[in-house]
Amino acid sequence: MSTHLPWAIVWLRHSLRLHDNPMIQRCIQEEYRPVVLYITPSRELEIDRWGFTPLGPHRKRFLMESLVDLRSQLEDHGVNLLYLEGDVIEQLSLVSTSLTSTKSIKIYADREYAYLDQKIEAEVEAAFDVTWFHAQLLTNPDDLPFSVKATPHIFSKFRGKIEKYVTIETLTEETNWSKMSQQEAALSALLQEYTKALPCDADDTLPKDNRQAFDFRGGETAALARLNDYLWNTEYVTTYKETRNGLIGPNYSTKFSAYLSLGCLSPKLVYHEIKRFEEEVVANQSTYWVIFEVLWREFFRYVAWQHGRHLFWPGGLQHKPVKLRTNHRFDAWYKGETGQPFVDANMRELNATGFMSNRGRQNVASYLVHDLGQDWRAGAAYFEHQLLDYDPCSNYGNWNYIAGVGNDPRAGRKFNVAGQAERYDAQGEFTLVWAD
């Protein structure tokens, strides 16, 4: 690619991959010279009202591993990846003026669906020439038999309409890297400095716990390896429905969620690989149930898009008049010191690894809200701080459910935690693993 072609910015938010990446594909197809950009917004690094930084150490390490992996792949094609932190508009302006001496640069970006992210999108759209893509969704919003504002309130109705009326698109056409050569024009010294700001390797100051259920390594390379292993090498996908409520070990669940949250794995790729597996190996309830869970993820994105800021309000999607509080009980909960063994074991796993099973999440959330009487938003914020697979739509959507202010037709999800422990940890093995 010759040096006279104009620069363009590919601003990746949570699509940290080369496969099924319409932003990069379109940029190169339209014969721009891409600079791939990732920005950690200021709020992710600042202490929130509950005393936590949204981007906690586990999440940050997983993010950095993912960016290092992506940068390595991009460099093989002669493309730079820049990592910045701070105000999004300021950082985009800095890169734009460094590349073109003006702000009139083309930007390709993936859309987000939570309120604050969409607020940023509106500001960016007002300041720059942006082409947006729904790279994080399984479905194309234009194909839905309902508008976003008319998204069904109940998941079963949403799922029914998707399965009946929507055809999932094929993956984005592969990027034609042959159009690219090593970029002849070096980036400015300023931008080269930003390129170096990304660690060359993962942060080793946060040791991994050998009790962890799965050795998560960030990045598209690890994500594709996990997908291939879970489906094709081991065929564990064929028993997913029976094992998904497990607590110990790497293969009781898919472990795809962390890779989906950063976009190291495309939801469309998961869907089409499952369909291919069903055609070539076997189709059963378990293979369908993986798609079922991907549809839950999709549902929460449309719900967040539909309801905006209400997803984060005390009264949630139902706008309930509620009085919420936090006190020393919340501190005991997040430290894993409530005295309830099953709750404490799950919280200790989260604190040590950044991961918790789906069964564990439901129980600890219910216990915080219904047994300890604490503000559900504090629990959601702590999950945001710790979870490798955090995304605002699924996280806050699920907390709305548990707190009884969300889409659940029932009043709330109060779990009998002791009964759950007897059912899912009958021998106490999981609790023992995470006992002090």
Q: PLM ranges: what are they?
A:
Residues 149-313, 421-436:
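Glycine/tryptophan-enriched, flexible segments
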Residues 249-436:
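Active-site-proximal binding-pocket segments
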Residues 1-170, 348-349, 394, 398:
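Trp/Phe/Arg-rich N-terminal binding region typifying the photolyase-homology
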